[in-house]
């Protein structure tokens, strides 16, 4: 409350806690997120979202939903939103999926290092590696994705989903977008 009283914004405290979590550990960072979420709660009047479910989802997290993810819309089934959290040193982005939204199968390539880390911050979603069963993600769940692993992630059919996507530094990194996740594959989620 003291930080808020001295002008620290919701976006600034989210960035601070994210950076600290890398040093203090995610369990401590997650506890701080939950405290900050209560202090920096979003007032009903602050929300410009027309969808009531989206408004309710927003209240569950400290990070902003961000803007419509138009740059990558061609790689998603459904609507997603993107909010940069950190773009220096390590790329960290809050990606929010509407119910039923998922990205295409894709691969994070790297000569060495690389890959991606996903941390669910609100809602419920799924992560799936090619050839394996989908893994449900709930707030606080973390998935480490090595480079060269074909995978997808997205929301549950009936719930909004937000995760932090953390770009693992590596040498000669790139992303390859592949085919869509079919309704048949998505329909098998439990």
Predicted feature descriptions by range:
Residues 88-90, 98-102, 124, 171:
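Short, charged/polar surface micro-motifs in flexible loops or helix N-caps
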Residues 82-83, 127, 163:
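Short hydrophobic/aromatic-rich beta-strand segments that constitute the beta-sheet cores
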Residues 102, 112-139, 149:
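A short beta-strand-loop-beta hairpin characteristic of the jelly-roll/cupin
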Residues 54-93, 104, 174-190:
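A short, N-terminal "cap"/entry segment at the start of jelly-roll beta-barrel domains
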Residues 97-100, 137-158:
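Conserved metal-binding segment of the jelly-roll/cupin
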Residues 1-56, 132, 138, 190:
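Hydrophobic alpha-helical segments
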Residues 93-112:
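Conserved short histidine dyad/triad with adjacent acidic residue
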Residues 158-177:
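A short hydrophobic beta-strand segment most commonly corresponding to one strand
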């Amino acid at each position: 409350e003291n930080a808020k009283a001295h002008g620290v914004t919701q976006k600034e405290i989210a960035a601070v806690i994210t950076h600290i979590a890398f040093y203090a550990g995610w369990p401590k960072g997650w506890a701080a997120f939950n405290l900050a979420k209560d202090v920096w709660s979003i007032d009903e009047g602050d929300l410009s979202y027309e969808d009531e479910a989206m408004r309710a989802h927003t209240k569950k997290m400290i990070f902003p939903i961000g803007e419509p993810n138009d740059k990558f819309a061609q790689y998603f089934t459904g609507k997603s939103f993107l909010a940069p959290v950190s773009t220096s040193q390590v790329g960290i982005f809050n990606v929010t999926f509407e119910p039923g939204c998922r990205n295409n199968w894709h691969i994070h390539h790297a000569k060495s290092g690389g890959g991606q880390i996903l941390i669910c911050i609100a809602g419920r979603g799924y992560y799936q590696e090619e050839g394996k069963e989908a893994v449900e993600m709930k707030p606080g769940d973390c998935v480490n994705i090595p480079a060269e692993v074909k995978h997808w992630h997205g929301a549950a059919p009936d719930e909004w989903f937000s995760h932090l996507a953390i770009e693992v530094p590596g040498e000669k990194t790139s992303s390859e977008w592949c085919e869509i996740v079919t309704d048949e594959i998505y329909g098998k989620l439990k």
